[in-house]
């Protein structure tokens, strides 16, 4: 079955541990794109520990870091270097719609 039609309702999707989110932050990742409904588990009582770890909230908030969840990448997109054009709606909120566009780069 195509990943475009995956039903995540009550399935317990894959998610990041707070330690994994911290690792990505320490590695220098500014814009995290993930193909699951959330970086946190479905039932976490609103703790959002992976979100908070990635953003270093509330100690040292990384206000320019972003998390884009539930992305869809077609199987035809092969691994390699890409330029990311992360377009976001001009909504002042803690969450907004985004439209990530990938442009393949040629390694010379």
What residue ranges belong to the model's regions?
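Active-/binding-site microenvironments in catalytic and ligand-binding cores
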Residues: 1-108
